Every structure is written in structure tokens, then in C-alpha cells.
Amino acid sequence: MKVVEVKHPLVKHKIGLMREGDISTKRFRELATEVGSLLTYEATSDFETEKVTIEGWNGPVEVDQIKGKKVTVVPILRAGLGMMDGVLEHMPSARISVVGIYRDEETLEPIPYFNKLASNMEERIALVVDPMLATGGSMIATIDLLKEKGCQQIKVLVLVAAPEGIEALEKAHPDVELYCAAIDEKLNDKGYIVPGLGDAGDKIFGTK
């Protein structure tokens, strides 16, 4: 599995700001969007382009346009919504496919409860967004669903990943690509990433 930890100074700086214990909901939300945008830039760097002639201000002009499969952005509810706008800044016409999965607090197992996917998934590249890759359960369940619907090219964008989550994802889906802003030390006994960001969903939505 291709794993890319984006080491750009802006990414590292912004993730550092997100680790502050008393960060406001507004600031955390803004930074999640900004880092999501920067990860998208990296994840799409291998998209192919083709020459197209358009009508410019002074007559026909040849330009580069992205070719190939269409893109669908797949936020995992609810925290994934916090990164979605950052992705859409670069691809505003991308279709949105929503997947709802929550983690059982006792067993840590993923529980699917909702999905609404774009049409013709077999013709699309999926950019799956979720702030944290902890145990990997929710991400694996989401990718299972996407593949069941025919999607074969999948890129995962997360803010912070744990080694345990990376290992689980690679074992289940070695053909996907993972882009993250940080790979942290480990999971604690409650399944949270350490040092991590805390509960990203609560920080994005201002809930406890």
C-alpha cells in the first residue's frame, strides 16, 4: 500500500496548531479544512492531463485539463465533513458520496448506519476523507462498501494516522493509497491516537 506522510512545512505547522488542548471549534474547523486542501493537492499529483483547445480572450488557446475518471469525495460521517470543503476547493464539480459509520465505544467495532453514493461508482476515483485513522475499522468498512459498488481506484486522506490503523488498512486493502499529515505513536486503550488531536468530531462540531 502506498503511504504518503506529507511533510510540507505548512502541513506540519497546521497540524501542530490543531494539537493545542484548548483550541476553539472555529479554529479547529478552519485548520481541518486547510489541511484537507493541502492533502488533496498531494493526492491528486498523479492525475493525468490532456491538451484541449478553448476559446481564449484573443482567440483559440491550448490548455491542460484533467482527463480520465471523474472524482467523488467520500466523507465518513460525521467528522469527515470537516475536511470535505478543503477537497472541494480544488474540485468543486466533484460528486459527494456520504457514508455513515460509528464506532462502538465498548468493542471499537465499526457500525454502518447510512450511505448515499454517487452514480456510476465504477467510473470514479474516490477520495475518502476522515480526520483520524485509528483502528482502521471505519475506513476499511467504507472501502468495502465502495468496492462492492464497483469503485476500484481509492485514495484515503486523513489528518493523523496510527501505525495500527495503517497496518490494518494495508492488510485489508493493499491497493488503496493513504495520504496523511502525520503518523503518530500509537493507540491508547480506548482506541484514541496518541498524541493525536483528541476527538476530532467533537472538536469540529463543538460537541462533547
Swiss-Prot record:
It is an enzyme of class 2 (transferase). Its cofactor is Mg(2+). Keywords: Allosteric enzyme, Glycosyltransferase, GTP-binding, Magnesium, Nucleotide-binding, Transferase. 5-phospho-alpha-D-ribose 1-diphosphate binds at R78, R103, D130, P131, M132, L133, A134, T135, G136, G137, S138, D199. Pathway: Pyrimidine metabolism; UMP biosynthesis via salvage pathway; UMP from uracil: step 1/1. Binds 1 Mg(2+) ion per subunit. The magnesium is bound as Mg-PRPP. Uracil binds at I193, G198, D199, A200. GO terms for molecular function: GTP binding; magnesium ion binding; uracil phosphoribosyltransferase activity. This is Uracil phosphoribosyltransferase. Catalyzes the conversion of uracil and 5-phospho-alpha-D-ribose 1-diphosphate (PRPP) to UMP and diphosphate. It comes from Vibrio vulnificus (strain YJ016). Belongs to the UPRTase family. The lineage of its organism: Bacteria, Pseudomonadati, Pseudomonadota, Gammaproteobacteria, Vibrionales. NCBIfam families: PRK00129.1 (NF001097), upp (TIGR01091). Its EC number is 2.4.2.9.
